[in-house]
Amino acid sequence: MKKLLLVLSTLTLLSFTEPCYKVTSVIASADAPDMKKERVIFGIKQLAEEIVSEKYTICSDGSPITVDLFSIEAPTTGVSIGPFTAIKKETIIKVKITKDGKEYIGEGTAKTTVKSTLIELQDENLPFEKTTFASAVKKSLLDAVSKM
């Protein structure tokens, strides 16, 4: 009888445990200008695992979670009045996280601004900032995970 109670209590405890997850794949289906895709994917996988672990349990044999970076937009806008110039680049990242067959879309935005006086910028397009990109990716992942 004691064994039966022990087995039943163990099964009850196991049924109430939270499911664990694993970030199995990261796909960058969008073009990443001036960046190596392998480095982008590796960084996103680490970020995704960190962010998902704040809400769910992560384990090596958990249910799969996939991340798809499907949109990278980086429009540049600028104003020039006489010797004064201000240029702003907004990096907009969109990710799709698939968990348990459901898709969650997240969007993140980060901005880079350059102001100059009496100095001409070499290139009207601002370079693709890695820190700005990482910030936008993190915001998009946080947005998608918050919808789970």
Give, region by region, the residue ranges found by the protein language model:
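Polar/charged alpha-helical tracts
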Residues: 42, 63, 100-102, 135, ...
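A structural "domain/chain start" motif
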Residues: 4-57, 61, 109, 143-148
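Surface-exposed short loop/turn segments
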Residues: 54, 63-126
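Solvent-exposed, acidic/flexible segments
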Residues: 37-41, 45, 86-88, 126, ...
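Compositionally biased, intrinsically disordered linkers/stalks adjacent to structured regions
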Residues: 27-30, 122-148
